[in-house]
Structure formats: C-alpha cells, structure tokens
C-alpha cells in the first residue's frame, strides 16, 4: 500500500512538473504576443531558413509585427514594424540595451570586452565614449581623407585597366579590397595587400565573422550540446581567438616601438588611453585588439555591402544610373578628374541612391540580438525579463504600410523630399540600429561610400554579362549575419 501511495505521489508530482509550463502558458496566454506552434525541445527553430530575415518576415505576416518564438528553451521576441521598434528602442531602450551572454562570443572576444557585444554597463559606456569621441568623430573622419583618396585612386586605376582591356571585372573583390585597405590604414597604419601578416589578419576576421554568425546549439538547447562538440565550435573559437590575439599583439608592439610617427592611427590613440588613463577612462592592453576588431568589421562589412548592393541596383536600373551620372557629371568636360568629398557631399540624388541601397539591403538585416533585463508591457503584451529580442530591420524597411506598394522596388526618388534619416530617430528606417546601441561608425562609412560611388559612376559606364544577370543571380543573398551578394558582381566598365 505504501508503495502505491508513493507511486501515486511521484506520478502526481511528475505530471505537475510536466504540465506546469502548459498551465502557465494557458493562464498567461492572453498577455503574451502571438506565437506559432512550437516543437518540443527545438521550439520554432524548424521554421527558420538559411535567410532568417526572410522566414521571420513570412511568419510576421501571419502572426503580426510583434511575435514570440522560442529557440529551444529561450524566448525570442521578434519585432517587424516601425511602431513596435519605436516603443522598444525609445520607450524601453534602457531595459533592452543589454546583450545576451553567449559562450562562443565571449571565447572569441575576451569575455566581450569591446563595443558591439559588451554587456551594458560602465565599461561599455567608457569604450563607446572612446570610439565616438576620440576615434570616429567628424574631425577624425576628415583627417583620414588622404587615405581614402589614395586607396580610391588605386581602385580607379584597376577599373581603368579593365576598361582599356575590355575585360570583365570582379567589382565585389575590388570593393572589399578598397574597404579593407582603408580600414587597415586607419586602424594600423598599413594595409592588407602589402604584408602577409595583414592578409592573415583578414582571414582571421572572416573566420570570426562566420563563428559569430553561426548558431550555438548548446546556448539554446543544452541537451544537444554534443552537436557543438562534434563540429568543434568552441575549439575553433579558441583557436581563432588565439591566432587573432597573437597577430594583434605584434601590431600593438610595433606601435609601442615606433617613435616620431607623423600621423596617429587608431591603435596609437587607444594606447594613449592605456598609458595615461585619459578622461577617467581606462583601456587595458588586452581590450585594444577587440575594440579594433569592432571598428575593422564595421568599416569593411557595412561599407562593402552598401557599395556592392548599390552598384548592383544601379546597373539593374539604367534610368537611375543615368540620373545619378547626370548629377555628378554636371557640365564637366573632363570626366577623368576625380570627384572630391567636398564636391559630392551636397548631391541630393547621390544621397537618395545610397539611402535606397541601405533601405533594401541593410548590412545586417537582423539587428544584433538584445536582451530584455526587466519585465515590460509592449503593445498590451507582457514580455518577461530574459527574453532575447530580434529586430528585423530588413522587414521594417520593406513594409508596404510605410513605403507603399512599391516597397520592394529600387526607387531613390522616394528619399528626395523625405525627412527620414539613418541616424536612428526614424524607426521606419534603421539600417544602423537605434538608441544606445546604434552603430557609432556611420560617419566613417558614409565618407568612403559617397566618394567611391560618385567616382565609379562618374568615370565609367557599366554593364553586366547577360549570362550572369537576372534576379536569381543579381539579388541572390549569401548566408551569414552580414548579407552580401551570393555571387560576385562581375561587370564590364567602359570609359564614359
């Protein structure tokens, strides 16, 4: 009899434990955002494709712009409209300013001691101040104008050669070389293409991007942690972190050994904070390498993606290309003269073209994950602390409610009389994010994008190989957190 009673008690307890989540969900379901049915253990992961920004938009069309998913055991709030983004990143910005602590990122990035993934707090505020005030301010951006001009000239010579030979040009490769070399010279004082060590640095950065953009199964489904072990996720993270750290240690030591340098790069400036603890801010030697990594990734990924996609859209829309060429060329008779930043900074159609490129192809379609640190009420729904937040900028910027029935079309004219800007105050248009976590390097990226695009369009006419065109080829996206073209942009430039 005692055995039966004990068995019944155990069965009751077990049933309660198993049914408790269902009971809780039933009681609270009226206060939770809409959510698709989820599979035990994996949650809603089976509903994601290789391009999650697209599959999440499809789900939002069915369940609404504020949607609750589960990646394994972790609740994920998906934001797909501007009004929800406004409430989240303005009204509740402080409550959602943190980042999830992911082991793979902390393994690579020294515990997350940099700008993008660092937890919100005093340290993050300090290093963001360093970046915004001392590295990426307007004066610093202007001081590197000569670097941009020199690397632009190198690029233009390569395009000129392809034009003279009537040979195909891999514009994607040329643009990533340009952006990498500019970022390298600004950060380290030298560029990738000149030294083997810098080429190795570039390779490690690519590996870091792939690891950060991957899905760490163990973080969301602990019982499947063996999958990460089999694919060697954390071993690769430790390996790339060590190799990258060793490379950066050499760079830092070279800067410490150098004397009487005529110009200061970012490493020099960061080292001055380590030596002097300037403005009450302390930057450790070990932190410098990862702050530089943030700047390098932001300076290459964002800029390259924007240039590549905007050139793609211009070539696909010859009427837009002609309007831009007419604006840039104006009454000039000598089109071989390079256009300076001062000449192009007030060109309205150029800015409209760039804005439209960013609207359709934001460099990071899904903004970097945020973590809710307090319970909030959002659009009448109760959202619990500990929920991770995905903002689908790609979906927001193609929303027909905001942008009209032609939201999927490349039409720069929509920006000519529009007050919308990408500085984070217009939530219909957030390619760089918004609030405390907005990208601090917008000015740095735009300075290179404007002058590069203007000179490519001014000096040459462009066409694609007819065999390598069409939407399936032109607009196919690669996988990863930074969505660039799946296929390289192969073009034929000709002298204007």
UniProtKB/Swiss-Prot annotation:
Topology versus the membrane: Single-pass membrane protein
EC number: 1.14.-.-
Transmembrane regions: 3-23
Keyword Membrane attributed: yes
Source superkingdom: Eukaryota
Family annotation (CDD domains): CYP71-like
Cofactor(s) listed: heme
Location relative to the cell: Membrane
GO cellular component assignments: membrane
Binding site for heme: 439
Record's keyword annotation contains Metal-binding: yes
GO terms assigned for molecular function: heme binding; iron ion binding; monooxygenase activity; oxidoreductase activity, acting on paired donors, with incorporation or reduction of molecular oxygen
Gene3D superfamilies hit by this protein: Cytochrome P450 (1.10.630.10)
Keyword line: Heme, Iron, Membrane, Metal-binding, Monooxygenase, Oxidoreductase, Transmembrane, Transmembrane helix
Database matches in PANTHER family: CYTOCHROME P450 71A2-LIKE, CYTOCHROME P450 FAMILY 71 PROTEIN
Family: Belongs to the cytochrome P450 family.
Protein's recorded name: Cytochrome P450 71A15
Gene name, Swiss-Prot/TrEMBL: CYP71A15
